Design a protein with these regions (language model features):
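Bacterial Sec-dependent N-terminal signal peptides
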Residues: 1-22
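Aromatic-residue-lined binding/catalytic grooves and analogous aromatic/hydrophobic interfacial grooves
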Residues: 21-497, 515, 535-541, 548, ...
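Short, surface-exposed recognition loops and adjoining beta-strand edges that mediate ligand/DNA contacts
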Residues: 409-427, 548-562, 740-754
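Well-ordered alpha-helical segments within folded domains of soluble proteins
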Residues: 431-442, 503-514, 572-582, 637-646, ...
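Non-catalytic carbohydrate-binding regions of carbohydrate-active enzymes
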Residues: 514-521, 525, 529, 537-547, ...
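Acidic/histidine-rich catalytic neighborhood
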Residues: 536-587
Length: 818
């Protein structure tokens, strides 16, 4: 479970008060269904596409380490299980540590020849040399090499609880995920009995809790069983009279893991059987407690000769300790501690969109409609502002459930996966996907959820130094397109450079380290953790560049990730380098260090090849004007400087902003879920709220499954986070050095409010608007920084004191501080 010894995290945020929940959870912020899932996809471990119920209709719970998906079937509850660090691959496969780390090619000596080929306009030669020499040695699929060293995130298995009931005669069925109470609840009537099941995953108690009850005594006749990962060896055995223990080892790398289950009951009996089951008979209620762990330990300084560099936990002992602690508490105490912890984060932000708008659906109350039917109505063009609020807050729920201090970050599917392998290994994709996962973290006041990402970045530094030296003769560290939990930072074996060559993955990740500081102003963090990561990434970026005879700097070879040719100076690469060098300069200034390096970084910035516009007026994606206005590719890499960067803006670079707009017009308003999420943010940065809102609508209509998970297709969680971040950008921006109030408010949201957003400089901001105009902004200074506020063309500057709150209104075209 919690595997990291973290440095002190600044106590930036006050816990919210636990609020009582309504009995009918569908009345709050919830995702719910009126039909149970089928059991047809049970144990489809080798074919995720066959299990549509898991992808489209299951409901996820998690404590960032241990997760599950609730299906709510009647005859047998099915719950898929995941532990965040259960991975195949790494240095402990049969190939050993030397085999695992022997993944880089020594290619730096070829850079002069490639660059000369660009000078000679021999683009084929430059591409060929890059293709053949700047890939790596590790395969990306388990059939491509044995043993499979990159590995994949893999399932912990599935739990089943047979009930002895059937759907015949069932009524009043509801399966609810309450995102404002972090509970999943299944309820239904059967033979004049109301059955209810409640599920949650507790971060403070490192346990998953399931409660089965009914409104009449003696109705719980349950059989718990477990189906393990087929690529593991293990056995379920009794652990006491009412408990089970499964200890397994993955065949690929010998990773050991453990799952414990303990039953508590009122009335009747519960007994563990010799064949690894728990059987309850005639109980009034049964509570299942589950704990899970692996032998994985995070390692920031791995020994490249040690096959067990990432082994350091005894999961049998750790799950036992977790279970003893959890079982010592009552169900009510476990639930209260879980909700208090969750709500201390979730309740920081509240949003209300058009609260007085009349209902437009043909139901007495919008809450009478299950979520998938509301989504179907929304797809037909019927407004549903409450659904938009739910989607926004669901992104925050998913981040809390999949990323908390003490573990690895949210992956391509957050925490939840249902197979031995999954799409793109369910890995850490470093060319936008993992970064997008964390776009909403700071702006929606979940800054501490960044810590798993920061720790992940720290695992890449030592391996990334080898990558930088081998391929570019560079100092510092970098990463490549795909990462795992074992420090993998190298390119993969594919010679398709359009996706496999992205040395800017490291610098892009490092910009998130600066973002965390910029929002929190935690100088201890910056000094001890942040700046060393940023500085080393900046050093790599400078060494990576080619200083041409005319004194300008460019990136050769380079690519625009997943799109187009090997190039002399792809715009994306220059934009990322601008960002990390500016971050490094600001970080060094904040600490009062490295004046010499600051001067060098500024010299590179001053001479870096600038943004270019092409024959269509577009911001060029490559060094040559080869953009196709009919190309609607999902990646919009060359607008990195617009978002998530800050070197393109309608305020500071209006002509380049116009060129960026042309790019977005050419790319269109469709594509994959995550791509629509990115373009939503980019349109918001252009201050075009109506077009951004169109992208938000398209994301919900065309990129969202019935359980509100984002779909590529298939399911990828990044689009959920991109959507939440994009809505925030519509209402508040702070990337240009000042706080912009309602910078891209769409006409559709005529009235509304949002509370608790975080702006850079560590300002908490509440906003209220009516008739499309700002009514009031309430700004709390958490760090005592000077504050500059902008609303439209109005600006206001004032000094602040730490802990003080300031109210801003607009009077006669001027911002006024009360």
């Amino acid at each position: 479970m919690k595997k990291t010894n973290l440095l002190l995290i600044s106590a930036l945020f006050a816990a919210s008060t636990l609020q009582a929940q309504t009995t009918d959870l569908t009345k709050g912020l919830s995702i719910w269904f009126d039909k149970p899932c089928s059991l047809s996809g049970m144990a489809s471990f080798y074919n995720y596409s066959a299990d549509r119920d898991w992808e489209e209709r299951s409901l996820p719970i998690g404590n960032a380490s241990f997760g599950g998906n609730i299906f709510g079937s009647i005859a047998a509850e099915r719950i898929t299980l995941n532990e965040k660090t259960l991975w195949r691959g790494g240095p402990n496969t049969s190939g050993g540590a030397e085999y695992y780390w022997n993944v880089n090619k020594e290619s730096a000596h070829l850079l002069p020849e490639i660059r000369q080929a660009f000078v000679d306009n021999d683009l084929k030669k430059a591409a060929k040399l890059t293709r053949e020499n700047f890939n790596g040695l590790a395969g990306y699929e388990d059939y491509s090499e044995q043993p499979f060293r990159f590995g994949s995130y893999t399932t912990l298995g599935e739990a089943y609880i047979e009930t002895g009931l059937s759907e015949i005669g069932m009524s009043d069925y509801k399966r609810v995920l309450s995102i404002d109470s972090a509970l999943a609840v299944v309820s239904f009537q059967k033979d004049d009995v109301k059955y209810e099941r409640t599920y949650f995953a507790s971060y403070p108690d490192s346990a998953m809790v399931w409660k089965f009850t009914a409104d009449k005594p003696g109705m719980q006749n349950l059989t718990f069983s477990y189906k393990g990962n087929p690529e593991a060896e293990g056995k379920m055995v009794a652990a006491g009279d009412k408990g089970l223990l499964y200890v397994g080892k993955l065949k690929n790398n010998g990773m050991e893991f453990a799952l414990r289950i303990q039953a508590q009951h009122k009335g009747g009996s519960v007994k563990a059987t010799a064949d690894g089951k728990l059987v309850a008979k005639g109980a009034d209620e049964v509570i299942f407690l589950l704990t899970a762990d692996t032998d994985y330990k995070i390692n920031f300084n791995p020994d490249f000769k040690d096959p067990k560099a990432y082994v350091g936990v005894d999961p049998v002992a750790s799950t036992d300790a977790m279970m003893k602690a959890a079982s010592a508490r009552s169900y009510d105490e476990l639930k209260a501690r879980h909700q208090e912890d969750y709500l201390s984060l979730f309740n920081r932000v509240k949003i209300s969109l058009n609260p007085n708008a009349p209902m437009t659906l043909e139901y007495p109350s919008i809450y009478d409609l299950p979520t998938y039917k509301r989504l179907a109505s929304y797809r037909k063009g019927k407004p549903d502002y409450k659904l938009e609020e739910i989607y926004y807050q669901y992104g925050r729920y998913l981040l809390i459930a999949s990323s908390r201090p003490g573990n690895m970050p949210a992956n391509l599917q957050g925490l939840w996966a249902n197979g031995v392998d999954g799409p793109w290994r369910v890995d850490y994709h470093n060319n936008i996907n993992i970064q997008m996962n964390y776009w909403p973290a700071c702006p929606t006041n979940l800054a501490e959820c960044n810590w798993p990402l920061i720790d992940f970045i720290r695992t890449l530094v030592k391996p990334g130094e080898k990558v930088a030296q081998s391929y570019f003769g560079a100092r510092g560290w970098t990463a490549s397109i795909s990462g795992n939990i074992f420090g993998f930072a190298s390119p993969l074996s594919s010679q398709d450079m359009s996706w496999n060559f992205n040395p800017m993955a490291g610098p892009w990740l490092a910009t998130h380290v600066w973002e965390y500081y910029d929002y929190t102003r935690d100088k201890q963090f910056l000094k001890e953790v942040g700046y060393p990561l940023i500085k080393s990434s900046a050093i790599f970026s400078v060494d990576f560049l080619w200083k041409r005879p005319d004194g300008s700097y460019t990136a050769a070879p380079s690519t625009s990730p997943e799109h187009g040719p090997v190039d002399e100076g792809a715009t994306f690469v220059h934009a990322v380098i601008r960002e990390i060098l500016l971050n490094a300069i600001d970080a060094a200034k904040a600490l009062g260090v490295d004046a010499k390096e600051r001067k060098q970084w500024q010299e590179v910035l001053d001479n870096l090849v600038p943004y270019k516009t092409g024959r269509y007026g577009q911001l060029m994606e490559w060094s040559r004007d080869i953009d196709d206005p009919k190309d609607e590719h999902r990646h919009v890499n060359h607008l990195f400087g617009l978002h998530p960067g800050h070197t393109l803006s309608p305020i500071t670079t209006p002509e380049l902003a116009k060129a960026a707009r042309i790019v977005l017009e050419h790319r269109g308003d469709g594509a994959t879920g995550w791509s629509m999420g990115w373009k939503l943010n980019q349109w918001a940065r252009l201050h075009d709220g109506n077009h951004a809102y169109k992208l938000f609508g398209n994301l919900l209509k065309n990129g969202t499954l019935d359980n509100l998970w984002d779909t590529h297709p298939p399911f990828q969680i990044d689009g959920n986070f991109g959507g939440t971040a994009g809505v925030t950008e519509l209402l508040l921006q702070s990337h240009m050095g000042f706080i912009q109030l309602l910078p891209a408010l769409p006409d559709a949201w005529e009235e509304g409010s949002i509370e608790g957003l975080l702006a850079r400089g560590n300002f908490e901001v509440d906003l209220r608007w009516a008739n499309g105009q700002l009514q009031e902004a309430v700004i709390t200074s958490n760090a005592g920084q000077p504050c500059q506020v902008r609303y439209g063309d109005q600006t206001l500057n004032f000094k602040t004191k730490k802990g003080q709150t300031y109210t801003i209104t607009s009077v006669d075209g001027k911002l006024v501080k009360k």
